[in-house]
Design a protein with these regions (language model features):
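Catalytic beta/alpha-barrel core
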Residues: 1-12, 25-36, 54-65, 89
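C-terminal alpha-helical cap/extension of soluble enzyme domains
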Residues: 76-141
Length: 141
């Protein structure tokens, strides 16, 4: 769900300013729950950027390989088009690889778990594995 109500957006902006005035940073997270093409993801990021967060996090759905490839394309374009730091990946049956590839393509951060337990999100890699994969990929890029 994406908030488009002007009064709600104004309240979000006020809250973000308040957090900034206290010396903290704001991560604005949006999980639309649908597949989106590159242009839609970039448009969403630019729409969210107007609220002036420090980091924008977007998670879309990848139901198949085409959605996954579109997420890679979107990450490359996000890096070029959006000034604010962006963390973007896809969830769903085909989205797992975007959690590693998108940070390599310029995503701001990787969401991981320190160790798995009963409440862990199993789609997230453990921190040690993610670090090893990304560090080794960067060596060949």
């Amino acid at each position: 769900e994406i908030v488009t109500d002007g009064s709600v957006i104004a309240k979000q902006c006020e809250f973000i300013e308040k957090v900034h005035s206290m010396g903290a940073e704001v991560l604005l997270s949006c999980h639309p729950g649908i597949s989106m093409n590159c242009e839609q993801v970039v448009g969403l990021a630019l729409f969210l950027e107007k609220r002036k967060p420090d980091i924008i996090k977007i998670v879309t759905l990848a139901e198949n390989e085409n959605d996954l490839i579109e997420s890679f394309k979107a990450m490359v374009m996000l890096k070029k088009e959006v000034k604010t730091a962006v963390s973007y990946h896809a969830s769903g049956v085909a989205g797992g690889l975007s959690r590693i590839v998108n940070p390599i393509l310029g995503g701001h951060m990787v969401f991981c778990v320190d160790r798995y337990n009963e409440g862990s999100t199993m789609e997230q890699l453990d921190l040690k594995t993610a670090r090893t994969v990304i560090d080794n990929m960067k060596k060949i890029m």
